Amino acid sequence: MDRFVWTSGLLEINETLVIQQRGVRIYDGEEKIKFDAGTLLLSTHRLIWRDQKNHECCMAILLSQIVFIEEQAAGIGKSAKIVVHLHPAPPNKEPGPFQSSKNSYIKLSFKEHGQIEFYRRLSEEMTQRRWENMPVSQSLQTNRGPQPGRIRAVGIVGIERKLEEKRKETDKNISEAFEDLSKLMIKAKEMVELSKSIANKIKDKQGDITEDETIRFKSYLLSMGIANPVTRETYGSGTQYHMQLAKQLAGILQVPLEERGGIMSLTEVYCLVNRARGMELLSPEDLVNACKMLEALKLPLRLRVFDSGVMVIELQSHKEEEMVASALETVSEKGSLTSEEFAKLVGMSVLLAKERLLLAEKMGHLCRDDSVEGLRFYPNLFMTQS
């Protein structure tokens, strides 16, 4: 902790903000200290920590002071952490929260998640070393320490050791890649054989497809799901998480909405999305918050709330006038319809069918007969035969 210096938190000239995350606690080695709830900012030059309650409490450390970083997984009652190993403090260091420390590393505890994306972006900055190409003001230059990530190796022995480490890392990556590829090929082969079997039976008409084969085929399709679902561990628990989730929802719901006439109830969306996400289940609250951002992000979907409180997702191209005109035409053909009868005719849920009929009634195209037999809708003759 003696590597940190007090700062205003303002970015210097040529310094750019990369990512930030709330709810981060700092450990001095394994020891808990008073800095337990703050916002951690990563710039091209520094790690900056600002207290969430007292914004005047702000400190920073140069990325050039970092030797290397590593991840520490979450445990029972413990948050995931990033361990940051540091060079010794320079002799001309400016004042900070600690003048000395026995530890050569700190831990960043992410109580509100987001550590995966933060670790990735920090690793990128340590690799690219942009602080070397974009010098900033003298106030930061004076605190520049030894260059991180470099192994002090002299002569042929050092070169050989470095080459050996690089070779081992390459071998490990290749082995893992081929192992994953083998598993993928086995699964793909099973899917191809099953698909051919079903297609041949349909083509040759040599018998019905058994129920077991249908279930197996559907399970393969569902297991494909979303390849990389948006999670709190990746994007944290704030607005960024809901924005990324909204973009992913727009991608996976486009085709199902087109197949269902351009509209789906939020309950249907919830079931469909969680089925595709597999183990990474989504809470109803997160789904609603993400759907509220669809229109603001100019995505092809939008959230709509009917007067009854029913929430639906619909395509931006879905027109209310066409929906009402279609409902009026169907009811006029049959003379009168209940919500259940209308739902069977148009192939949608009873909930959405009722909302469509109520909307047509609100616009004056239909009228109702609410009796002991239930709610029945009729064409409004005052409008159609005027």
UniProtKB/Swiss-Prot annotation:
Family: Belongs to the VPS36 family.
Effect the entry attributes to changing E70A: Reduces affinity for ubiquitin up to 10-fold
Coiled coil stretches, renumbered: 160-185
Origin organism lineage: Eukaryota, Metazoa, Chordata, Craniata, Vertebrata
Descriptive protein name: Vacuolar protein-sorting-associated protein 36
A Gene Ontology biological process term: multivesicular body assembly
Outcome reported for the amino acid change (mutating L10D): No effect on interaction with ubiquitin
UniProt KW keywords: Coiled coil, Cytoplasm, Endosome, Lipid-binding, Membrane, Nucleus, Protein transport, Transcription, Transcription regulation, Transport
Listed GO CC annotations: cytosol; endosome; ESCRT II complex; extracellular exosome; late endosome membrane; lysosome; nucleus
Organism: Homo sapiens
Subunit structure: Component of a complex at least composed of ELL, SNF8/EAP30, VPS25/EAP20 and VPS36/EAP45. Component of the endosomal sorting complex required for transport II (ESCRT-II), composed of SNF8, VPS36 and two copies of VPS25. Interacts with VPS25, SNF8, TSG101 and CHMP6. Interacts (via GLUE domain) with ubiquitin. Interacts with RILPL1 (via the C-terminal domain); which recruits ESCRT-II to the endosome membranes. Interacts with ECPAS.
Domain free text: The GLUE domain (GRAM-like ubiquitin-binding in EAP45) mediates binding to ubiquitin and phosphoinosides.
